């Protein structure tokens, strides 16, 4: 047992002796000085602790709890490509499209770090395909800028808009071209042609 925890527990015992009242836990109040670390769904997901995420939610942990960046467990599971945690969070009632401080959803972030399977799972369970972040960027624009053809194709298959533009006026093709990803440009143009025919 570490010194901080020992001191805390000793303090509870001393308070009981001084006041004659039982410790707060015995009265139904759960005091845990380490709760910010151990009982935070977002942090457990960030650290890829699937068992901890499951346990926290099963014991009443809020699945959409946010950290200082406004990110939830779903954001971190998407970034990490942790399909198990995504599934646990979905089962626990977590939102699919929460926005963090910059307006990014889990789908934005999964696309940004090339987590193909996380993108596909989020799309399959009904994540919004075209949300804008604070810069007006959609997951398709982000995937296009990263050059990930597989993610671009997955987004297009779910109906991602190729005509939406961000605050600079660039669309997904513009981002792919500027980032020198000709394969992405071709994939988007093929999808546009297929829609027209």
Model-derived features: positions:
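Conserved ankyrin/ankyrin-like repeat signature
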Residues: 52, 84-85, 117-118, 150-151, ...
């Amino acid at each position: 047992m570490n010194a901080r925890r020992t001191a805390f527990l000793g303090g509870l015992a001393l308070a009981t002796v001084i006041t004659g009242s039982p410790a707060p836990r015995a009265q139904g109040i759960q005091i845990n000085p380490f709760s910010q670390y151990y009982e935070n769904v977002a942090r457990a997901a960030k650290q890829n602790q699937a068992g901890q995420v499951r346990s926290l939610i099963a014991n009443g942990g809020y699945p959409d709890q946010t950290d200082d960046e406004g990110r939830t467990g779903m954001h971190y599971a998407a970034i990490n490509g942790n399909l198990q945690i995504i599934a646990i969070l979905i089962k626990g009632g977590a939102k699919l499209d929460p926005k963090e401080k910059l307006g990014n959803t889990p789908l934005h972030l999964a696309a940004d770090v090339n987590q193909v399977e996380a993108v596909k799972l989020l799309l399959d369970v009904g994540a919004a395909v075209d949300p804008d972040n604070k810069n007006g960027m959609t997951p398709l624009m982000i995937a296009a800028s990263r050059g990930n053809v597989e993610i671009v194709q997955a987004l297009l298959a779910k109906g991602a808009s190729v005509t939406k533009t961000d605050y600079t006026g660039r669309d997904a093709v513009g981002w792919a071209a500027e980032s020198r990803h000709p394969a992405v440009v071709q994939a988007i143009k093929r999808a546009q042609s297929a829609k027209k025919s």
